[in-house]
A protein has these predicted regions:
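Intracellular juxtamembrane helix-capping segments at the cytosolic ends
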Residues: 140-155, 351-365
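Helix-loop junctions at membrane interfaces in 12-TM secondary transporters
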Residues: 30, 115-132, 330-342
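Helix-loop boundary and gating motifs at the non-cytosolic
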Residues: 2-80, 85, 89, 96-106, ...
Length: 458
Protein backbone atom coordinates (compact mmCIF):
# COMPACT_ATOMS: atom_id res chain seq x y z
CA UNK A 1 0.00 0.00 0.00
CA UNK A 2 0.96 3.63 -0.27
CA UNK A 3 2.75 5.62 2.44
CA UNK A 4 -0.58 7.14 3.46
CA UNK A 5 -1.49 3.79 5.05
CA UNK A 6 1.74 3.31 7.06
CA UNK A 7 0.94 2.50 10.66
CA UNK A 8 -2.81 2.31 10.06
CA UNK A 9 -4.39 -0.94 11.16
CA UNK A 10 -8.16 -0.53 11.05
CA UNK A 11 -10.44 -0.26 8.03
CA UNK A 12 -11.84 3.03 9.27
CA UNK A 13 -8.36 4.57 9.57
CA UNK A 14 -7.48 3.52 6.01
CA UNK A 15 -10.75 4.91 4.65
CA UNK A 16 -10.10 8.22 6.42
CA UNK A 17 -6.56 8.36 5.00
CA UNK A 18 -7.92 7.67 1.51
CA UNK A 19 -10.50 10.45 1.83
CA UNK A 20 -7.81 12.78 3.15
CA UNK A 21 -5.60 12.13 0.10
CA UNK A 22 -8.52 12.84 -2.23
CA UNK A 23 -9.32 16.18 -0.62
CA UNK A 24 -5.65 17.16 -0.33
CA UNK A 25 -5.12 16.68 -4.08
CA UNK A 26 -8.58 17.79 -5.17
CA UNK A 27 -7.47 21.11 -6.65
CA UNK A 28 -4.91 19.65 -9.08
CA UNK A 29 -7.05 16.60 -9.90
CA UNK A 30 -10.03 18.87 -10.51
CA UNK A 31 -7.91 20.96 -12.87
CA UNK A 32 -6.60 17.86 -14.65
CA UNK A 33 -10.05 16.42 -15.29
CA UNK A 34 -11.35 19.84 -16.29
CA UNK A 35 -8.65 20.49 -18.89
CA UNK A 36 -8.69 16.91 -20.18
CA UNK A 37 -12.45 17.09 -20.63
CA UNK A 38 -12.44 20.55 -22.16
CA UNK A 39 -9.82 19.76 -24.82
CA UNK A 40 -10.40 16.04 -25.15
CA UNK A 41 -14.16 16.19 -25.40
CA UNK A 42 -13.97 19.13 -27.80
CA UNK A 43 -12.02 17.01 -30.26
CA UNK A 44 -14.10 13.87 -29.71
CA UNK A 45 -17.30 15.80 -30.31
CA UNK A 46 -16.15 16.51 -33.85
CA UNK A 47 -16.00 12.73 -34.32
CA UNK A 48 -18.99 11.62 -32.23
CA UNK A 49 -21.50 14.34 -33.10
CA UNK A 50 -24.19 12.91 -35.43
CA UNK A 51 -23.07 15.15 -38.29
CA UNK A 52 -19.47 15.00 -39.56
CA UNK A 53 -18.90 11.21 -39.65
CA UNK A 54 -22.37 10.33 -41.04
CA UNK A 55 -22.05 13.09 -43.64
CA UNK A 56 -18.52 11.94 -44.59
CA UNK A 57 -19.63 8.33 -45.02
CA UNK A 58 -22.61 9.47 -47.09
CA UNK A 59 -20.34 11.56 -49.31
CA UNK A 60 -17.99 8.58 -49.81
CA UNK A 61 -20.72 5.98 -50.43
CA UNK A 62 -24.05 7.67 -51.16
CA UNK A 63 -25.69 4.92 -49.08
CA UNK A 64 -27.79 5.10 -45.92
CA UNK A 65 -26.80 1.52 -45.12
CA UNK A 66 -23.10 2.42 -45.16
CA UNK A 67 -23.82 5.30 -42.77
CA UNK A 68 -25.52 2.76 -40.49
CA UNK A 69 -22.63 0.33 -40.90
CA UNK A 70 -20.14 2.99 -39.79
CA UNK A 71 -22.08 3.72 -36.59
CA UNK A 72 -22.53 -0.02 -36.04
CA UNK A 73 -18.82 -0.83 -36.40
CA UNK A 74 -17.78 2.02 -34.10
CA UNK A 75 -20.09 0.77 -31.35
CA UNK A 76 -19.33 -2.89 -32.03
CA UNK A 77 -15.70 -2.25 -31.18
CA UNK A 78 -16.79 -1.20 -27.70
CA UNK A 79 -19.06 -4.17 -26.97
CA UNK A 80 -16.64 -6.63 -25.34
CA UNK A 81 -13.60 -4.49 -24.59
CA UNK A 82 -15.04 -2.65 -21.51
CA UNK A 83 -15.50 -5.88 -19.54
CA UNK A 84 -11.96 -7.05 -20.29
CA UNK A 85 -10.67 -3.63 -19.27
CA UNK A 86 -12.63 -3.70 -16.01
CA UNK A 87 -11.32 -7.17 -15.18
CA UNK A 88 -7.78 -5.86 -15.66
CA UNK A 89 -8.05 -2.58 -13.77
CA UNK A 90 -10.30 -3.46 -10.80
CA UNK A 91 -7.48 -5.42 -9.12
CA UNK A 92 -4.80 -2.73 -9.73
CA UNK A 93 -3.82 -0.18 -7.12
CA UNK A 94 -3.14 2.42 -9.82
CA UNK A 95 -4.57 2.52 -13.33
CA UNK A 96 -3.21 5.79 -14.72
CA UNK A 97 -0.51 4.15 -16.93
CA UNK A 98 -2.95 1.78 -18.64
CA UNK A 99 -5.44 4.64 -18.99
CA UNK A 100 -2.84 6.72 -20.83
CA UNK A 101 -2.11 3.84 -23.22
CA UNK A 102 -5.79 3.32 -24.01
CA UNK A 103 -6.36 7.04 -24.46
CA UNK A 104 -3.40 7.32 -26.83
CA UNK A 105 -4.52 4.37 -28.97
CA UNK A 106 -8.02 5.84 -29.22
CA UNK A 107 -6.60 9.12 -30.53
CA UNK A 108 -4.35 7.37 -33.04
CA UNK A 109 -7.44 6.11 -34.88
CA UNK A 110 -8.66 9.69 -35.42
CA UNK A 111 -5.28 10.55 -36.93
CA UNK A 112 -5.48 7.46 -39.13
CA UNK A 113 -8.89 8.51 -40.49
CA UNK A 114 -7.43 11.92 -41.32
CA UNK A 115 -4.36 10.50 -43.10
CA UNK A 116 -6.47 7.97 -45.04
CA UNK A 117 -8.52 10.82 -46.48
CA UNK A 118 -5.41 12.42 -47.94
CA UNK A 119 -3.65 9.30 -49.19
CA UNK A 120 -6.47 6.99 -50.33
CA UNK A 121 -9.57 7.21 -52.47
CA UNK A 122 -12.64 5.33 -53.65
CA UNK A 123 -13.54 2.01 -52.07
CA UNK A 124 -10.15 1.73 -50.35
CA UNK A 125 -10.76 4.99 -48.50
CA UNK A 126 -14.27 3.96 -47.48
CA UNK A 127 -13.13 0.57 -46.16
CA UNK A 128 -10.23 2.21 -44.30
CA UNK A 129 -12.50 4.75 -42.60
CA UNK A 130 -14.87 1.95 -41.51
CA UNK A 131 -11.93 -0.09 -40.18
CA UNK A 132 -10.50 2.79 -38.17
CA UNK A 133 -13.96 3.61 -36.81
CA UNK A 134 -14.11 0.03 -35.51
CA UNK A 135 -10.69 0.42 -33.85
CA UNK A 136 -11.76 3.79 -32.45
CA UNK A 137 -14.68 2.04 -30.76
CA UNK A 138 -12.49 -0.87 -29.66
CA UNK A 139 -10.20 1.44 -27.66
CA UNK A 140 -12.99 3.84 -26.72
CA UNK A 141 -14.74 1.16 -24.65
CA UNK A 142 -11.92 0.41 -22.19
CA UNK A 143 -10.74 4.03 -22.25
CA UNK A 144 -14.17 5.12 -21.06
CA UNK A 145 -14.11 2.64 -18.19
CA UNK A 146 -10.59 3.61 -17.15
CA UNK A 147 -11.11 7.38 -17.15
CA UNK A 148 -14.50 7.23 -15.46
CA UNK A 149 -12.92 5.00 -12.81
CA UNK A 150 -10.17 7.60 -12.35
CA UNK A 151 -12.83 10.30 -12.01
CA UNK A 152 -14.57 8.28 -9.30
CA UNK A 153 -11.27 7.75 -7.44
CA UNK A 154 -10.14 11.38 -7.59
CA UNK A 155 -13.29 13.52 -7.37
CA UNK A 156 -15.85 13.26 -4.51
CA UNK A 157 -19.38 12.45 -5.64
CA UNK A 158 -20.63 15.80 -4.31
CA UNK A 159 -18.32 17.66 -6.74
CA UNK A 160 -18.61 15.56 -9.91
CA UNK A 161 -21.74 17.15 -11.30
CA UNK A 162 -20.45 20.71 -11.22
CA UNK A 163 -17.00 19.63 -12.48
CA UNK A 164 -18.56 18.03 -15.53
CA UNK A 165 -20.95 20.93 -15.91
CA UNK A 166 -18.19 23.56 -16.04
CA UNK A 167 -16.01 21.25 -18.13
CA UNK A 168 -18.79 20.76 -20.66
CA UNK A 169 -19.55 24.47 -20.64
CA UNK A 170 -15.97 25.37 -21.58
CA UNK A 171 -15.61 22.49 -24.01
CA UNK A 172 -19.02 23.26 -25.49
CA UNK A 173 -18.08 26.85 -26.27
CA UNK A 174 -14.91 25.73 -28.04
CA UNK A 175 -16.58 22.77 -29.76
CA UNK A 176 -19.58 24.75 -30.95
CA UNK A 177 -17.43 27.48 -32.47
CA UNK A 178 -15.00 24.93 -33.86
CA UNK A 179 -17.74 22.81 -35.44
CA UNK A 180 -19.18 25.80 -37.25
CA UNK A 181 -15.70 26.83 -38.40
CA UNK A 182 -14.88 23.27 -39.50
CA UNK A 183 -18.13 22.85 -41.41
CA UNK A 184 -18.16 26.24 -43.10
CA UNK A 185 -14.45 26.72 -43.81
CA UNK A 186 -12.60 23.39 -43.54
CA UNK A 187 -15.24 21.12 -45.13
CA UNK A 188 -16.92 23.84 -47.18
CA UNK A 189 -13.56 25.11 -48.46
CA UNK A 190 -12.09 21.60 -48.86
CA UNK A 191 -8.97 22.75 -47.00
CA UNK A 192 -5.77 20.78 -47.79
CA UNK A 193 -7.63 18.78 -50.42
CA UNK A 194 -9.99 17.08 -47.94
CA UNK A 195 -11.83 19.25 -45.43
CA UNK A 196 -13.02 16.24 -43.44
CA UNK A 197 -9.45 15.00 -42.98
CA UNK A 198 -8.36 18.45 -41.85
CA UNK A 199 -11.21 18.47 -39.31
CA UNK A 200 -10.14 15.08 -37.92
CA UNK A 201 -6.51 16.20 -37.70
CA UNK A 202 -7.66 19.16 -35.63
CA UNK A 203 -9.63 16.77 -33.40
CA UNK A 204 -6.50 14.63 -32.92
CA UNK A 205 -4.40 17.63 -31.87
CA UNK A 206 -6.97 18.86 -29.34
CA UNK A 207 -7.60 15.46 -27.75
CA UNK A 208 -3.88 14.69 -27.53
CA UNK A 209 -3.16 18.02 -25.82
CA UNK A 210 -5.85 17.30 -23.23
CA UNK A 211 -4.47 13.83 -22.53
CA UNK A 212 -0.91 15.12 -22.10
CA UNK A 213 -1.88 17.88 -19.67
CA UNK A 214 -4.01 15.41 -17.70
CA UNK A 215 -1.07 13.04 -17.19
CA UNK A 216 1.12 15.88 -15.89
CA UNK A 217 -1.40 17.28 -13.40
CA UNK A 218 -3.24 14.47 -11.65
CA UNK A 219 -2.27 12.47 -8.56
CA UNK A 220 -3.98 9.09 -8.39
CA UNK A 221 -4.77 7.66 -4.94
CA UNK A 222 -4.37 4.01 -4.03
CA UNK A 223 -7.67 2.77 -2.60
CA UNK A 224 -7.65 1.18 0.87
CA UNK A 225 -8.99 -2.04 -0.65
CA UNK A 226 -8.79 -3.55 -4.13
CA UNK A 227 -10.68 -6.48 -5.47
CA UNK A 228 -8.76 -9.74 -5.67
CA UNK A 229 -7.86 -10.68 -9.24
CA UNK A 230 -10.47 -13.08 -10.62
CA UNK A 231 -10.37 -15.12 -13.86
CA UNK A 232 -12.57 -13.62 -16.57
CA UNK A 233 -14.87 -16.65 -16.70
CA UNK A 234 -15.59 -16.46 -12.96
CA UNK A 235 -16.06 -12.70 -13.12
CA UNK A 236 -18.62 -13.01 -15.90
CA UNK A 237 -20.56 -15.54 -13.83
CA UNK A 238 -20.92 -12.91 -11.11
CA UNK A 239 -22.76 -10.45 -13.36
CA UNK A 240 -26.19 -12.07 -13.03
CA UNK A 241 -26.01 -12.29 -9.19
CA UNK A 242 -24.85 -8.65 -9.17
CA UNK A 243 -28.02 -7.65 -11.02
CA UNK A 244 -30.23 -9.92 -8.91
CA UNK A 245 -28.87 -8.54 -5.63
CA UNK A 246 -29.23 -4.94 -6.79
CA UNK A 247 -32.67 -4.59 -8.43
CA UNK A 248 -32.34 -0.83 -8.77
CA UNK A 249 -29.26 -1.27 -10.95
CA UNK A 250 -31.04 -4.00 -12.93
CA UNK A 251 -34.04 -1.80 -13.73
CA UNK A 252 -31.69 1.08 -14.56
CA UNK A 253 -29.89 -1.18 -17.04
CA UNK A 254 -33.19 -2.07 -18.72
CA UNK A 255 -34.16 1.61 -18.94
CA UNK A 256 -30.73 2.51 -20.30
CA UNK A 257 -30.99 -0.26 -22.89
CA UNK A 258 -34.26 1.15 -24.22
CA UNK A 259 -32.82 4.67 -24.21
CA UNK A 260 -29.83 3.50 -26.23
CA UNK A 261 -32.08 1.55 -28.60
CA UNK A 262 -33.41 4.94 -29.66
CA UNK A 263 -30.07 5.51 -31.37
CA UNK A 264 -31.54 3.71 -34.38
CA UNK A 265 -32.37 7.26 -35.44
CA UNK A 266 -29.24 9.21 -34.55
CA UNK A 267 -27.18 8.80 -37.77
CA UNK A 268 -30.19 9.81 -39.84
CA UNK A 269 -31.00 13.18 -38.31
CA UNK A 270 -28.46 14.99 -40.49
CA UNK A 271 -29.23 12.80 -43.54
CA UNK A 272 -32.95 13.58 -43.14
CA UNK A 273 -32.25 17.31 -42.98
CA UNK A 274 -29.91 17.06 -45.97
CA UNK A 275 -32.63 15.41 -48.03
CA UNK A 276 -35.07 18.20 -47.10
CA UNK A 277 -32.97 21.35 -47.42
CA UNK A 278 -29.77 20.10 -49.10
CA UNK A 279 -26.26 19.20 -47.97
CA UNK A 280 -23.57 21.83 -47.59
CA UNK A 281 -20.66 22.47 -45.30
CA UNK A 282 -22.54 25.40 -43.78
CA UNK A 283 -25.63 23.27 -43.01
CA UNK A 284 -23.49 20.58 -41.37
CA UNK A 285 -21.55 23.17 -39.39
CA UNK A 286 -24.65 25.08 -38.28
CA UNK A 287 -26.53 22.01 -37.05
CA UNK A 288 -23.41 20.66 -35.33
CA UNK A 289 -23.13 24.07 -33.69
CA UNK A 290 -26.71 23.69 -32.43
CA UNK A 291 -26.12 20.16 -31.15
CA UNK A 292 -22.92 21.10 -29.32
CA UNK A 293 -24.15 24.49 -28.15
CA UNK A 294 -26.68 22.61 -26.06
CA UNK A 295 -23.77 21.30 -23.97
CA UNK A 296 -22.63 24.87 -23.46
CA UNK A 297 -26.01 26.20 -22.36
CA UNK A 298 -27.27 23.17 -20.43
CA UNK A 299 -24.16 21.65 -18.86
CA UNK A 300 -24.03 23.86 -15.76
CA UNK A 301 -27.70 23.22 -15.12
CA UNK A 302 -27.23 19.46 -15.52
CA UNK A 303 -24.26 19.50 -13.14
CA UNK A 304 -25.88 21.43 -10.30
CA UNK A 305 -29.15 19.53 -10.77
CA UNK A 306 -27.26 16.24 -10.39
CA UNK A 307 -25.34 17.42 -7.30
CA UNK A 308 -28.58 18.51 -5.65
CA UNK A 309 -31.08 15.84 -6.71
CA UNK A 310 -28.97 12.99 -8.09
CA UNK A 311 -28.16 11.84 -11.61
CA UNK A 312 -31.52 10.08 -12.14
CA UNK A 313 -33.15 13.50 -12.57
CA UNK A 314 -30.81 14.24 -15.49
CA UNK A 315 -31.77 11.01 -17.21
CA UNK A 316 -35.51 11.69 -16.90
CA UNK A 317 -35.34 15.25 -18.26
CA UNK A 318 -32.94 14.18 -21.04
CA UNK A 319 -35.49 11.64 -22.30
CA UNK A 320 -38.15 14.37 -22.42
CA UNK A 321 -35.78 16.53 -24.49
CA UNK A 322 -35.11 13.66 -26.91
CA UNK A 323 -38.79 12.84 -27.43
CA UNK A 324 -39.86 16.45 -27.91
CA UNK A 325 -36.98 17.33 -30.23
CA UNK A 326 -37.48 14.30 -32.47
CA UNK A 327 -41.17 15.16 -32.88
CA UNK A 328 -40.20 18.75 -33.67
CA UNK A 329 -37.62 17.62 -36.24
CA UNK A 330 -40.30 15.72 -38.18
CA UNK A 331 -42.72 18.65 -38.09
CA UNK A 332 -40.56 21.56 -39.31
CA UNK A 333 -38.45 22.50 -42.32
CA UNK A 334 -37.24 26.05 -41.68
CA UNK A 335 -33.54 26.48 -40.74
CA UNK A 336 -34.43 28.16 -37.42
CA UNK A 337 -36.70 25.35 -36.22
CA UNK A 338 -34.26 22.70 -37.41
CA UNK A 339 -31.58 24.50 -35.38
CA UNK A 340 -33.87 24.38 -32.32
CA UNK A 341 -34.58 20.67 -32.88
CA UNK A 342 -30.87 19.84 -33.04
CA UNK A 343 -30.30 21.99 -29.96
CA UNK A 344 -32.89 19.90 -28.10
CA UNK A 345 -31.29 16.65 -29.28
CA UNK A 346 -27.92 17.91 -28.05
CA UNK A 347 -29.37 18.99 -24.71
CA UNK A 348 -30.85 15.53 -24.22
CA UNK A 349 -27.58 13.89 -25.17
CA UNK A 350 -25.68 16.10 -22.70
CA UNK A 351 -27.99 15.25 -19.82
CA UNK A 352 -28.05 11.56 -20.66
CA UNK A 353 -24.26 11.28 -20.88
CA UNK A 354 -23.74 13.01 -17.54
CA UNK A 355 -26.30 10.73 -15.90
CA UNK A 356 -25.29 7.42 -17.49
CA UNK A 357 -21.59 7.91 -16.78
CA UNK A 358 -22.05 8.77 -13.10
CA UNK A 359 -25.17 7.14 -11.69
CA UNK A 360 -23.58 3.70 -12.14
CA UNK A 361 -21.03 4.54 -9.42
CA UNK A 362 -23.77 4.98 -6.81
CA UNK A 363 -25.47 1.59 -7.08
CA UNK A 364 -23.03 -0.54 -5.06
CA UNK A 365 -19.63 -1.02 -3.40
CA UNK A 366 -16.49 0.73 -4.65
CA UNK A 367 -14.65 -2.54 -5.37
CA UNK A 368 -17.27 -3.52 -7.98
CA UNK A 369 -17.40 -0.07 -9.54
CA UNK A 370 -15.26 -0.86 -12.60
CA UNK A 371 -17.26 -3.97 -13.51
CA UNK A 372 -20.61 -2.18 -13.07
CA UNK A 373 -19.41 0.58 -15.35
CA UNK A 374 -18.01 -1.91 -17.87
CA UNK A 375 -21.20 -3.97 -17.91
CA UNK A 376 -23.27 -0.84 -18.37
CA UNK A 377 -21.04 0.46 -21.17
CA UNK A 378 -20.98 -2.94 -22.89
CA UNK A 379 -24.77 -3.06 -22.94
CA UNK A 380 -24.81 0.48 -24.33
CA UNK A 381 -22.26 -0.35 -27.03
CA UNK A 382 -24.15 -3.50 -28.04
CA UNK A 383 -27.42 -1.64 -28.49
CA UNK A 384 -25.61 1.25 -30.18
CA UNK A 385 -24.05 -1.22 -32.62
CA UNK A 386 -27.28 -3.01 -33.47
CA UNK A 387 -29.50 0.07 -33.42
CA UNK A 388 -28.08 2.07 -36.35
CA UNK A 389 -27.89 -1.04 -38.53
CA UNK A 390 -31.55 -1.80 -37.83
CA UNK A 391 -32.27 1.87 -38.38
CA UNK A 392 -30.59 1.74 -41.77
CA UNK A 393 -32.79 -1.15 -42.87
CA UNK A 394 -35.92 0.63 -41.61
CA UNK A 395 -34.90 3.91 -43.27
CA UNK A 396 -34.21 2.17 -46.58
CA UNK A 397 -37.52 0.29 -46.57
CA UNK A 398 -40.03 2.35 -44.56
CA UNK A 399 -38.54 5.84 -44.48
CA UNK A 400 -37.00 8.20 -41.94
CA UNK A 401 -40.22 9.00 -40.06
CA UNK A 402 -40.66 5.34 -39.13
CA UNK A 403 -37.12 5.27 -37.72
CA UNK A 404 -37.82 8.38 -35.67
CA UNK A 405 -41.07 6.94 -34.24
CA UNK A 406 -39.28 3.74 -33.22
CA UNK A 407 -36.79 5.93 -31.33
CA UNK A 408 -39.59 7.86 -29.61
CA UNK A 409 -41.30 4.65 -28.43
CA UNK A 410 -38.02 3.32 -26.97
CA UNK A 411 -37.41 6.59 -25.15
CA UNK A 412 -40.95 6.61 -23.76
CA UNK A 413 -40.52 3.07 -22.37
CA UNK A 414 -37.23 4.09 -20.73
CA UNK A 415 -38.93 7.14 -19.20
CA UNK A 416 -41.73 5.05 -17.66
CA UNK A 417 -39.24 2.53 -16.23
CA UNK A 418 -37.19 5.29 -14.58
CA UNK A 419 -40.23 6.97 -13.07
CA UNK A 420 -41.84 3.78 -11.76
CA UNK A 421 -39.08 1.27 -10.94
CA UNK A 422 -35.75 3.09 -10.44
CA UNK A 423 -35.24 4.94 -7.16
CA UNK A 424 -32.57 7.62 -7.00
CA UNK A 425 -29.60 5.55 -5.68
CA UNK A 426 -28.15 8.46 -3.73
CA UNK A 427 -31.37 8.78 -1.77
CA UNK A 428 -31.41 5.04 -1.10
CA UNK A 429 -27.78 5.10 0.06
CA UNK A 430 -28.37 8.01 2.43
CA UNK A 431 -31.38 6.22 3.88
CA UNK A 432 -29.33 3.06 4.50
CA UNK A 433 -26.53 5.09 6.11
CA UNK A 434 -29.06 6.79 8.40
CA UNK A 435 -30.55 3.42 9.37
CA UNK A 436 -27.06 2.05 10.04
CA UNK A 437 -26.16 5.06 12.20
CA UNK A 438 -29.42 4.72 14.12
CA UNK A 439 -28.78 1.01 14.69
CA UNK A 440 -25.26 1.75 15.95
CA UNK A 441 -26.64 4.43 18.26
CA UNK A 442 -29.22 2.05 19.67
CA UNK A 443 -26.55 -0.62 20.15
CA UNK A 444 -24.30 1.86 21.97
CA UNK A 445 -27.18 2.94 24.21
CA UNK A 446 -28.03 -0.67 25.01
CA UNK A 447 -24.40 -1.47 25.83
CA UNK A 448 -24.16 1.57 28.10
CA UNK A 449 -27.33 0.61 29.94
CA UNK A 450 -26.07 -2.94 30.34
CA UNK A 451 -22.75 -1.72 31.79
CA UNK A 452 -24.62 0.52 34.25
CA UNK A 453 -26.79 -2.42 35.32
CA UNK A 454 -23.69 -4.55 35.79
CA UNK A 455 -22.13 -1.80 37.90
CA UNK A 456 -25.23 -1.54 40.07
CA UNK A 457 -25.22 -5.30 40.60
CA UNK A 458 -21.62 -5.19 41.73
Amino acid sequence: MSDIYDGLTTEQQREEAYEGFIWKNLRRNYAGHYIHGMLGMTGFRLVNAPTFIPAYLHVLSGSDLVVSLGACLQQLGGVISPIFAAQQIESRKKILPVSMFLGTMMRVQILAIAIAGWLLGGTTLLVSVLFFLFLFGLFSGPQGVAFQFLLAKMIPISRRGRLQGWRNLSGGIVAAALSYFAGKYLVGGNVWGNGYSTTYLLAFVLTSAGLTIFSLLVREPEPPTVRKSTPMRDRLRELVPMLRNNPGFGYFMIARTFAIASRVAQPFYIIYVGKRIGFSGEVIGTLTLAFLMADTVMSIGWGYLADRYGFRSNFIIALVFWIGSTILLMAVSSPLWLFIAFFGLGAGNSGYMMSAQNIVFEFGHRDDMAMRLAFSNTAESLMSAIGPLVGGVIAATLGYHTVFWVAIVCEAIALVLLLVLVEEPRKARLRLEAEKARALSETSTTDLAQREDDGDNV
